[in-house]
């Protein structure tokens, strides 16, 4: 079995996503995978009530991070694979054959169960967020709408126990009036730097 080399993995930072969807900026597979990992860990804590720093939670968060970082690794060989192409390739088992060449690390990280469900939901959330923030034009809006429909269909059919946590996270992400805490933290640090 072939395995991915470190040089193969480093190519993820150069493989761009959204080839057929107009966006206002580019995104690499590496950026996408990192964002999916962050969202999946947040979603896991929301769903389970766990907190980072708790031993059991940290073990699960580690597994989630690994799966999220690996989930699109085969795209270092193929480039970004858009959804219509994935549907076509899945029908012919070509994606399974490609994934089998990625090596044991990739295959082990893709085991099923609740962690895979969590990462799949985070993958949807990250893509919807990216299109909401950076999608450009009518076609991008149509893609966002279709992605949102597939997201809710996935929750209803495959992840009903995750629905409330996933929808709440999407509402938070899609709130255009929401603020980050960056400047609050800077001001706090300034005020307490004595």
From Swiss-Prot:
Required cofactor names: Co(2+)
Gene that produces this protein: datZ
Binding site for Co(2+) 2: 75, 80
Reactions listed under catalytic activity: dATP + H2O = 2'-deoxyadenosine + triphosphate + H(+); dADP + H2O = 2'-deoxyadenosine + diphosphate; dAMP + H2O = 2'-deoxyadenosine + phosphate
Source species: Salmonella phage PMBT28
Protein keywords: ATP-binding, Cobalt, Hydrolase, Metal-binding, Nucleotide-binding
Family per record: Belongs to the Caudovirales dATP triphosphohydrolase family.
Protein residues bound to Co(2+) 1: 32, 71-72, 123
Binding-site list for dATP: 17
Name the UniProt record assigns to this protein: dATP triphosphohydrolase
Reported function: Catalyzes the hydrolysis of dATP, dADP and dAMP into dA. This step is essential for Z-genome synthesis (containing aminoadenine instead of adenine). Specifically removes dATP and its precursor dADP from the nucleotide pool of the host, preventing the incorporation of A into the phage genome and favoring the integration of the Z-base into the viral genome.
Molecular function in Gene Ontology: ATP binding; hydrolase activity; metal ion binding
Co-factor remark: Uses a typical 2 metal-ion mechanism to dephosphorylate dATP.
A family per Pfam: YfbR-like
């Amino acid at each position: 079995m072939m395995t991915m080399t470190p040089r193969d993995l480093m190519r993820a930072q150069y493989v761009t996503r959204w080839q057929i969807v107009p966006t206002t900026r580019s995104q690499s597979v590496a950026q996408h995978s990192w964002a999916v990992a962050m969202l999946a860990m947040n979603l896991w804590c929301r769903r389970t009530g766990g907190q980072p720093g708790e031993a059991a939670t940290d073990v699960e968060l580690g597994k989630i991070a690994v799966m999220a970082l690996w989930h699109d690794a085969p795209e270092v060989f193929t480039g970004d694979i858009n959804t219509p192409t994935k549907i076509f390739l899945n029908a012919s088992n070509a994606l399974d054959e490609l994934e089998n060449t990625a090596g044991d690390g990739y295959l082990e990280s893709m085991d099923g169960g609740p962690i895979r469900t969590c990462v799949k939901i985070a993958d949807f959330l990250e893509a919807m967020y990216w299109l909401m923030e950076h999608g450009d034009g009518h076609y991008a809006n149509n893609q966002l709408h279709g992605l949102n429909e597939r997201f809710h269909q996935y929750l209803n059919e495959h992840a009903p126990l995750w629905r409330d946590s996933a929808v709440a996270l999407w509402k938070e992400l899609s709130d255009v009036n929401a603020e980050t805490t960056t400047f609050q933290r800077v001001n706090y640090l300034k005020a307490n730097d004595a």
